[in-house]
């Protein structure tokens, strides 16, 4: 395979890690439903590249990286074919789960999250959705499966709860839908203006959690290289504080999506890698 995530272990080491929480990392270089800025197919590579910019020690947590992560490479995608790409995603995630690993998936556009979460029994799972957009359209550009419809399709899988964090863009129909279905959301202004209140509300939630992070949840000043940049976003500090709370609880999977750049050093890729490291440092093993 090509470039691996920094500090990741060889797959052959899995047999020696049976007593530890192990993360299996997969890339999904798919962006065929992108509608504004394509390029998230380069996201897995750019996040891996950015991972080498960080130390394996956290000054904040006063600890070395002690959670094993095994980079399993990229899933085969068929550009222009969501259905078969989604099938490939689900099959690979099932393999990761059968090996007792927790999946971390790097996109790619946000539609790929559907292929990941449909492998789980979601009846007791809370989906934590960090995003600038609600992604609750029933159809978008004539398609039922799209980066703009992904959370609507996930809602139809009947998770215990969906909580949307950092949203600031939607259609009238999407807003009416989340209100009618009692889907909880916190806007970016809620977070900026009432951060401690929102943080406490998130801390009260029960896991297990599946966490999906569209990097455009960050303000474009921190993450310009995304598929749909939207001003008045949250900051990396807000993300770090959310992760501190979330990582104390049971997490069944994580994805980070919509890094849309092919430029080494792009802040979107750097922040995506930092978010992943924050989870790995904060999670208890």
From Swiss-Prot:
Keyword NAD: no
Keyword Magnesium: no
Signal sequence, start to end: none
Sites where the protein binds Mn(2+) 1: 110, 131, 135, 214
InterPro entries from the UniProt entry: Agmatinase-rel (IPR005925), Ureohydrolase (IPR006035), Ureohydrolase_dom_sf (IPR023696), Ureohydrolase_Mn_BS (IPR020855)
CDD domains in alphabetical order: Agmatinase-like_2 (cd11593)
Binding site residues for Mn(2+) 2: 131, 133, 214, 216
Keyword set, alphabetical order: Hydrolase, Manganese, Metal-binding
One Pfam family matching this protein: Arginase
CC cofactor: Mn(2+)
Biological processes, Gene Ontology terms: putrescine biosynthetic process from arginine, via agmatine
A GO term for molecular function: agmatinase activity
Family: Belongs to the arginase family.
PANTHER family for this protein: ARGINASE/AGMATINASE (PTHR11358), GUANIDINO ACID HYDROLASE, MITOCHONDRIAL (PTHR11358:SF26)
Identification of the protein by name: Uncharacterized 32.2 kDa protein in hmfB 3'region
Source species of the chain: Methanothermus fervidus
Lineage: Archaea, Methanobacteriati, Methanobacteriota, Methanomada group, Methanobacteria
């Amino acid at each position: 395979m090509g470039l691996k995530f920094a500090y990741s272990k060889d797959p052959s080491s899995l047999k020696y890690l049976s007593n530890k929480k192990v993360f299996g990392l997969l890339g999904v270089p798919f962006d065929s439903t992108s509608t504004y800025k394509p390029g998230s197919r380069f996201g897995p590579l750019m996040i891996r590249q950015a991972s080498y910019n960080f130390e394996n020690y956290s000054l904040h947590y006063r600890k070395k990286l002690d959670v094993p992560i095994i980079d399993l490479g990229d899933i085969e995608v068929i550009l222009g074919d969501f259905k078969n790409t989604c099938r490939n995603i689900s099959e690979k995630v099932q393999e990761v789960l059968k090996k007792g690993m927790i999946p971390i998936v790097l996109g790619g556009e946000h539609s790929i999250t559907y292929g990941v979460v449909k492998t789980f029994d979601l009846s007791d799972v809370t989906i934590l959705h960090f995003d600038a957009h609600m992604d609750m359209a029933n159809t978008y550009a004539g398609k039922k499966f799209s980066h703009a419809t992904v959370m609507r399709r996930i809602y139809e899988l009947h998770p215990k709860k969906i909580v949307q964090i950092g949203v600031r863009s939607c259609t009238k129909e999407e807003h009416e839908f989340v209100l009618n279905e009692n889907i909880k959301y916190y806007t970016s202004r809620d977070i900026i203006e009432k951060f401690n209140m929102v943080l406490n509300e998130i801390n009260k939630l029960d896991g297990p959690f599946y966490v999906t992070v569209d990097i455009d949840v960050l303000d474009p000043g921190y993450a310009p290289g995304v598929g749909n940049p939207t001003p008045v976003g949250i900051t990396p500090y807000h993300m770090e504080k959310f992760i501190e709370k979330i990582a104390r609880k049971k997490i069944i999977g994580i994805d980070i999506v919509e890094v849309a750049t092919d430029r080494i050093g792009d802040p979107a890729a750097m922040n995506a890698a930092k978010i992943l490291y924050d989870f790995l440092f904060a999670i208890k093993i």
